[in-house]
Design a protein with these regions (language model features):
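N-terminal metal-binding scaffold of metallo-dependent hydrolase/deaminase domains
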Residues: 2-77, 407
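Active-site gating loops and adjacent loop-to-helix segments of metal-dependent hydrolytic enzymes
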Residues: 102-135, 261-279, 297-300, 347-364
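Active-site core of metal-dependent hydrolases
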Residues: 182, 188-199, 211-319, 330, ...
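His/Asp/Glu-enriched, well-ordered alpha-helical/loop segment
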Residues: 268-278, 322-404
Length: 436
């Protein structure tokens, strides 16, 4: 081990996020109920025969008509797909991912040592210039891969900084348009380099929101990184208020520092009546709070309509989902970075991320494993304002088919997603995207 490597010095990617902390739509973002067939036009219908919803012992048929599941008979001439006794499960939602940064599908990238958020951000810039594949192609490649693994929607954070201009949001926007048949995407303009500490960033965030390139504007560690709590929140919430976009702020700050920032975010949300439009991601100051303090904070978050996201990084940093949900706080699960300058890990597979959530939570019981899956399927859906896909009549015909015994076993074994269905149409088969 090199004496100055992150491991030798105790500075890891996770450690940097935690240690530094110690020192805030496009039409494609919402899944509207499928419209009824226009007069004179036949309904678009598919029957998925011989499937087992949630691992039911007796196979049944799922009938999709114009994008919705129905209890009625399929119209004459409906397409038939044989499920072969596979288990049908709802597709999932990635509530926090960075597709603009990815080197997914590129030649292997050797990462350089980094010891702070600022240094990791510098590595982002180096990788951006080193990769030969255009950002929009890399983002689309990763987002398409996510579809093949059963993701139906995602909230994509794209860096906004003078080093990139708006290339990130434009590239992810291009991928969103090309994958709109298979994937809902919400885009966040993310100021990875800081809102205040990097001149020119606030103007780019304003432009991205004004032109409709983003659905949300982001922020990052207002105290620990930007060192300007009020000024950063003035900018972020001001842009959101002026342009009618949401907010999603990265908050890695811990303990009292994180709580100070979080309570300031709560106050801004209430003051501008942005309830239901604000998310705080990671929120490392919440895990480990004493029970009474956690309950009080959860009640404040719920009253302000603020949602949270976690990427299940470790047992000590994952959010206490059950306790938060009991107070009415919505919590989404996400992939975070995937094969980028920050980490060689990640795969944009939300079933795997739900598996990791169960693992860091020491899940043993079937109901605990099922709850981890529901966090990936339902938590993000509620965050993005999407209808849940519980395989019942009237729900979106969005589901995946896998071989297995039951849901808990599938979460543990992570079998191949044999078929991915979006609005009643097969969009991926055997790990590959199908035609549009």
């Amino acid at each position: 081990m090199h004496p100055h490597s992150p491991a030798a010095t105790g500075l890891t990617r996770r450690g940097v996020l935690v240690g530094t902390a110690a020192l805030a739509g496009a039409a494609a973002t919402a899944t509207a109920p499928a419209a009824e067939a226009a007069p004179g036009h036949p309904a678009r219908a598919t029957v998925f025969r011989n499937v087992r919803p949630y691992g039911a012992k007796r196979p049944t048929d799922l009938v999709a008509v114009d994008g919705l599941l129905t209890s009625g008979p399929a119209p004459h001439g409906a397409e038939v797909v044989d499920g072969g006794g596979r288990i049908a499960l709802p597709t999932l939602v990635d509530a926090h991912i960075h597709p603009d940064k990815t080197a997914w599908g590129e030649p292997w990238v050797s990462r350089n040592p980094a010891g702070s958020i600022a240094e990791y951000a510098e590595e982002d810039v180096k990788l951006y210039h080193a990769l030969r594949t255009p950002l929009k192609e890399r983002a689309e490649r990763l987002m398409g891969h996510a579809v093949t693994r059963g993701t139906r929607a995602m909230r994509a954070h794209a860096d906004v900084a003078p080093a990139f201009d708006l290339a990130g949001v434009e590239g992810v926007g291009s991928a969103r348009r090309n994958l709109r048949h298979a994937l809902d995407v919400e885009i966040v303009g993310f100021p990875q380099h800081g809102v205040i500490r990097t001149p020119g960033t606030r103007e780019l965030l304003e432009e991205a929101a004004r032109t409709g390139a983003v659905d949300r504007v982001g922020g990052i560690d207002p105290i620990g990184f930007d060192e300007a709590l009020d000024e950063q929140l003035d900018v972020v919430f001001g842009i959101a208020d002026r342009h009618g976009v949401g907010v999603d702020i990265h908050l890695h700050e811990r303990a009292a520092t994180g709580l100070e920032s979080l309570r300031a975010i709560i106050a801004r949300t209430r003051a501008l009546s942005l309830q239901g439009k604000v998310t705080v991601s990671h929120v490392f100051c919440v895990p480990g709070l004493p029970g009474r303090e956690l309950d009080q904070l959860a009640a404040e978050l719920a009253d302000a309509g603020i949602s949270l996201t976690t990427v299940a990084p470790s047992s000590d940093l994952v959010l206490p989902l059950d306790r938060l949900r009991a107070h009415g706080v919505e919590v989404g699960l996400g992939s975070d970075g995937v094969r980028d300058s920050w980490s060689p890990f990640g795969n944009a597979d939300m079933l795997h991320r739900a598996h990791l959530l169960a693992w860091v939570g020491d899940a043993r019981l079937d109901e605990e494993l099922e709850a981890a899956f529901r966090a990936g399927a339902d938590g993000g859906a509620r965050l993005l304002g999407l209808p849940e896909t519980d395989l019942k009549p009237g729900c979106p015909a969005d589901f995946l088919l896998v071989r297995g015994e039951c849901l808990p076993q599938i979460l543990v074994d992570l079998p191949q997603r044999d078929l991915v269905v979006r609005a009643g149409r097969v969009v991926a088969r055997d790990g590959e995207l199908t035609g549009r």
